[in-house]
Regions:
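Glycine-rich Rossmann-fold phosphate-binding loop(s) that bind the pyrophosphate
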Residues: 3-9, 27
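Gly/Ala-rich phosphate-binding loop of Rossmann-like dinucleotide-binding domains
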Residues: 12, 16, 151
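Glycine-rich FAD pyrophosphate-binding loop
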Residues: 16-36
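Conserved dinucleotide-binding and phosphotransfer motif residues
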Residues: 18, 103, 154-155
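Short loop/edge segments at beta-strand edges and connector loops
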Residues: 26, 111-112, 161-163
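Short beta-to-alpha linker loops that shape the active-site pocket of alpha/beta-hydrolase fold enzymes
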Residues: 28-30, 115, 148
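Dinucleotide-binding Rossmann-like beta1-alpha1 core, especially the glycine-rich loop
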Residues: 40-118
Length: 182
């Protein structure tokens, strides 16, 4: 697997736990230095198109109840989010609320008075109302990445850092990868 960010580490964890031989290759001196390390790290079933929301819902149980020993602290902590709307965005906000409700995600509609109480920094003359998502979470991306890496190694995966793949070829049974360190 090339890349030891969250995607590569989670794949290594799954494959190694399934008994597959895994080598995880990372060009940086440590995993998670790029997009994983800069992730906004929100878990929101209300975010994204329907396919993304379905994947988010499907992963909720894992994040709330990871396998024993996966992480020392919870991976998720509650975080509310607001979707604000100007006067011209009311119809879109209504469609969003209906679309989310159809997939089982309930949101609370805040009028301008409740919105001003919830977010006093927002300009009350600009935003008419908002949807409040009380089912969102902050994700501990570092704990998640470390859980995947630790679990992958415990299941036999090897992690190589500071090397780059130069060429790769499949021989019919496995991949052979030439690395920058020889």
């Amino acid at each position: 697997i090339i890349g030891a960010g969250i995607a590569g580490a989670s794949l290594a964890w799954r494959l190694a736990r399934a008994g597959r031989p895994v080598v995880l290759i990372e060009r940086e001196p440590q995993p998670g230095m790029h997009s994983t390390g800069r992730s906004a790290a929100m878990f929101m079933e209300s975010y994204g198109p329907p396919g993304v929301r379905a994947l988010t819902r499907a992963s909720r149980d894992f994040y709330l109840h990871p396998p024993a020993g996966f992480a020392e602290a919870p991976l998720l902590s509650p975080r509310h989010a607001l979707f604000v709307a100007t006067a011209g965005q009311q119809a879109a906000l209504g469609r969003m609320q209906a679309d989310l409700a159809a997939s089982g995600t309930t949101m609370t509609l805040l009028n301008s008075e409740l919105l001003a109480q919830a977010a006093p920094a927002l300009k009350p003359d600009l935003f008419q109302n908002a949807l409040l998502d009380e089912q969102g979470y902050d994700m501990d991306v570092h704990a998640l990445l470390q859980g995947f890496l630790r679990g992958a190694r415990q299941a036999g995966a090897r992690l190589l850092t500071g090397v780059q793949p130069l060429r790769a070829a499949h021989d019919g049974q496995r991949w052979r990868v030439a690395l920058s360190d020889g």
